[in-house]
């Protein structure tokens, strides 16, 4: 028998405040048509005062645990993928651990910006396969509205806040691609491109800073690298793009999503798209899309799913799993 890390629960949380594109017209030289044409985004959610990355992560986690019929005390580990932790330390994951009332196991954060959830899933898979954990909560949560430069129309209209979570559990499989669970992963980074997407603050500056992005350069890297990492992960799983039921990409920009699908040879009716409603929620975007796709009845048990993401660093990767 082969051990597999299987998704048994999924959930998400979105703040109540919905911000349509038209709201930016009041303060910026932009409009709804311009934003939609360049990104596919129509609206996004922003966290309220008092809402935090950790509180959103905990809410998404409760939904995932509920779906799985599990309690917080059943969980061995929590991994939170985020670039907007509430404090420098302790980690967002330990804050979630406390909020859920989990008094055992361990918790830590992963920071790979928009690729963070893919990196966190890979880490969780390794923990399960090595026998260090049997149940792992994997969460992507972000409050990007708090690192926006509201005078920069090229970035502030793109991002939103929210959280998504999955519960991974160890289950026995047959060792074939028919197994439920994570079948393969592929992770990459290249620090030579660190200046393409970054925040200009941190402990070295004594400021929180703002997100800065060379959008055209990021786009040029994104489609090529996303298609390549997805192809590598599919090959490692012993499957091909034609076998895939659903591509669940990082929801950064509809043009990147469409370009990557075309390069993979996958039609858009097999791609879960939520960018129009959520904007770019960075590490939260894939678990949000998984949860929404499942709730819509798109993603069903037994479906072959590939997720792929790229973020600042640059860091990029993909995970192939059977739901």
Swiss-Prot record:
One of its GO terms (molecular function) is 3-oxoacyl-[acyl-carrier-protein] synthase activity. Belongs to the thiolase-like superfamily. FabH family. This is Beta-ketoacyl-[acyl-carrier-protein] synthase III. GO terms for biological process: fatty acid biosynthetic process; secondary metabolite biosynthetic process. The last Arg residue of the ACP-binding site is essential for the weak association between ACP/AcpP and FabH. It is found in: Cytoplasm. Keywords: Acyltransferase, Cytoplasm, Fatty acid biosynthesis, Fatty acid metabolism, Lipid biosynthesis, Lipid metabolism, Multifunctional enzyme, Transferase.
């Amino acid at each position: 028998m082969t051990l597999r890390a299987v998704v048994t629960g999924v959930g998400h949380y979105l703040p109540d405040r919905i911000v349509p594109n038209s709201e930016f017209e009041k303060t910026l030289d932009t409009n709804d048509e311009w934003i939609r044409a360049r990104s596919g985004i129509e609206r996004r959610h922003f966290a309220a005062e008092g809402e935090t990355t950790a509180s959103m992560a905990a809410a998404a986690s409760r939904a995932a645990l509920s779906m799985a019929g599990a309690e917080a005390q059943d969980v061995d580990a929590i991994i939170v993928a985020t670039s907007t932790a509430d404090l420098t330390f302790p980690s967002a994951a330990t804050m979630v651990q406390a909020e859920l009332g989990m008094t055992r196991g361990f918790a830590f954060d992963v920071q790979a910006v928009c690729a963070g959830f893919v990196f966190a899933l890979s880490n969780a898979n390794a923990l399960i396969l090595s026998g260090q954990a049997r149940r792992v909560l994997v969460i992507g949560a972000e409050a990007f509205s708090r690192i926006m430069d509201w005078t920069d129309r090229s970035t502030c209209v793109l991002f939103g806040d929210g959280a998504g979570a999955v519960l991974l559990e160890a289950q026995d499989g047959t060792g074939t691609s028919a197994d439920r669970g994570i079948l393969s992963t592929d992770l990459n980074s290249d620090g030579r491109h660190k200046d393409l997407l970054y925040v200009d603050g941190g402990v070295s500056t004594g400021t929180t800073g703002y997100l800065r992005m060379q959008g055209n350069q990021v786009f040029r890297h994104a489609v090529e690298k996303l298609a390549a990492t997805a192809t590598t992960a599919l090959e490692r799983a012993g499957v091909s793009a034609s076998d895939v039921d659903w591509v669940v990409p990082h929801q950064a920009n509809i043009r990147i999503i469409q370009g990557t699908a075309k390069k993979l040879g996958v039609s858009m009716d097999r791609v879960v798209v939520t960018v129009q409603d959520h904007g770019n929620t960075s590490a939260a975007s894939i678990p949000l899309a998984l949860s929404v796709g499942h709730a819509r009845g798109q993603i069903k048990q037994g479906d072959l799913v590939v997720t792929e993401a790229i973020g600042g660093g640059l860091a990029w990767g993909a995970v192939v799993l059977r739901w």
